[in-house]
Amino acid sequence: MATMAPGCLLPIHYHTGTAEVYTFSGCWRYAEYPDQPQTAGDYLYEPGGSVHTFYCPEDNTEDTVVLLWMEGAQIGFNQDGTLHHINDATSIQHVTETVSAAQGTGPVGYIHGGAAGVVKS
């Protein structure tokens, strides 16, 4: 689940696998598809390899809240086409745990790769 303020802009990127997005509130779009705004109640399926630039319009009157499901890695680029980032399950877990610890929101439950596990709340 992600919450983004009006004006949020992510670097151009693609996913090596599929991505699915369900929008709970607000509005977002891909810059490459300005005629396809996603608003509360919308579901988007995105095939792997689809290149796009995610943004929330600056004139949104509320935060945009989405549930994201991604398979594989996310590969992001700078405006000049150079590599900006590679996010995968391991890097996302690290960032999530680091931010959670900094905010004091408690441990984040994960089933770690290599073995089945139980997430305790």
PLM regions with names:
Residues H13-H15, H52:
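Histidine-centered active-site/metal-ligand motif
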